[in-house]
């Protein structure tokens, strides 16, 4: 089947105005991403505030994104939950709306074991028959997909990629030894480790800060493919990432999408917006990044 994309996929933030999804801002944002070298758009994931979106909102957001993208890049829908049947239902709706692939997080709260993960993911994949990106983010789920389990899952024709947010490079090396990387893609789920991830053979990143600087990330990936040393090129991005670490994702990046006019910096409870002083510091860091010609 090959890789869904290579380079930068954007973990799309959801713009809100007065606590409602701002679909006009969403359309502008997606057009901006397409114009600035995004290679894939990932909808309704962690950065989208998935837990506080209704099923209807998720479907509407996906439909808008699919329509704006119009086949130019793959659209990946975050449809995974800790309920296998609900995940199937959401994934089938995503397929009908026009998603090119689905992303499935490991079950959370009602944690399972590795055999349960295999059964969960393969049941969804076989029911939906779309390319699947597994999402391993133990910091949020307290559950990990062992490398051996990923190897087993990769035997399923639909399970073709992993978003790896472990920040564990021993895990990455284990995966590389077990998988056919011509057919199975490894995407970083951590913006701040992409130099090492790219240097060690990763196929791309599903990025938060690429909501505002997709071209910078894609340029970094392209430079690595040309065997360039990308550490110095990454340094301005790292400085911006340090500023973004002021609070949990997606609170800070919403302040930056607001700067670009894609909604405002609203988030839904239980998330709360940045303190004014923190927001101002972050906006200053972003302005310095842009003044440096890095975007």
From Swiss-Prot:
General function of this protein: Catalyzes the condensation of (S)-aspartate-beta-semialdehyde [(S)-ASA] and pyruvate to 4-hydroxy-tetrahydrodipicolinate (HTPA).
Sites where the protein binds pyruvate: 47, 206
Highest classification ranks of the organism: Bacteria, Bacillati, Bacillota, Bacilli, Bacillales
Protein's name according to its UniProt entry: 4-hydroxy-tetrahydrodipicolinate synthase
EC number of the protein: 4.3.3.7
Species this protein is from: Staphylococcus saprophyticus subsp. saprophyticus (strain ATCC 15305 / DSM 20229 / NCIMB 8711 / NCTC 7292 / S-41)
Major subcellular site: cytoplasm
Disulphide-bonded residues: none
Alphabetized Gene3D superfamilies for the sequence: Aldolase class I
């Amino acid at each position: 089947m090959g890789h869904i994309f290579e380079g930068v996929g954007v973990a799309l933030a959801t713009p809100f105005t007065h606590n409602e999804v701002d679909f006009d801002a969403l359309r502008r944002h997606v057009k901006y991403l397409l114009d600035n070298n995004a290679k894939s758009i990932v909808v309704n994931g962690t950065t989208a505030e998935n837990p506080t979106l209704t099923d209807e909102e998720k479907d509407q957001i996906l439909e808008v994104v699919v329509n704006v993208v119009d086949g130019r890049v793959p659209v990946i829908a975050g449809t995974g939950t800790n309920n296998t049947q609900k995940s199937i239902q959401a994934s089938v709706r995503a397929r009908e709306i026009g998603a090119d692939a689905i992303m499935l997080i490991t079950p959370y709260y009602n944690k399972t074991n590795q055999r349960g993960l295999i059964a969960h993911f393969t049941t969804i994949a076989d029911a939906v028959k779309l390319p699947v990106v597994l999402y391993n983010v133990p910091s949020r789920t307290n559950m990990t997909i062992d490398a051996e389990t990923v190897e087993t899952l990769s035997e399923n024709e639909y399970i073709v990629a992993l978003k790896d947010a472990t920040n564990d490079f021993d895990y990455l090396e284990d995966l590389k030894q077990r998988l056919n990387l011509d057919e199975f893609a490894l995407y970083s789920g951590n913006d701040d480790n992409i130099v090492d991830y790219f240097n060690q053979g990763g196929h791309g990143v599903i990025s938060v800060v690429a909501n505002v600087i997709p071209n910078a990330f894609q340029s970094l990936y392209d430079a690595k493919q040309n065997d360039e040393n990308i550490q110095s090129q990454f340094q301005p991005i790292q400085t911006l990432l340090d500023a973004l670490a002021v609070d949990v994702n997606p609170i800070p990046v919403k302040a930056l999408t607001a700067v670009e006019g894609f909604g405002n910096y609203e988030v839904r409870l239980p998330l709360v917006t940045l303190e004014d002083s923190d927001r101002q510091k972050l906006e200053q860091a972003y302005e310095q990044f842009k003044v440096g010609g890095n975007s």
